């Protein structure tokens, strides 16, 4: 008779968000990455106003090639696996592009 023991490890996700800076000029390119660690590999999703914007396994990125004032706001990164769920937030601030021709 053969006895076997298996140990299954599970670790709830932990999130790390890379965003420098948090303020951007309208029209610039922006990329914000949310990375999560955990066992098993977590699913990562970005949300704004409860609408999913991006998803991936272990990482998900918010990418704006031409950020607009309407992109301004609070975004939520959520990571989950069988061991748990966690979330973190980032505030995206978009400033108007200064145009010298508008100055009188």
What residue spans do the PLM features occupy?
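Immunoglobulin-superfamily
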Residues: 1-104
């Amino acid at each position: 008779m053969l006895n076997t023991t298996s140990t299954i490890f599970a670790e709830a996700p932990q999130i790390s968000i890379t965003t420098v800076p948090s303020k951007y000029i309208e029209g610039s390119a922006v990329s914000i990455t949310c990375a999560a660690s955990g066992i098993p590999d977590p699913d990562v999703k970005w949300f704004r106003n409860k609408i999913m914007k991006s998803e991936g396994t272990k990482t998900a990125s918010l990418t704006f090639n031409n950020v607009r004032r309407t992109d301004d706001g609070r975004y939520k990164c959520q990571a989950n696996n069988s061991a748990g769920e966690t979330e973190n937030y980032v505030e995206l601030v978009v400033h108007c592009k200064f145009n010298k021709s508008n100055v009188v």
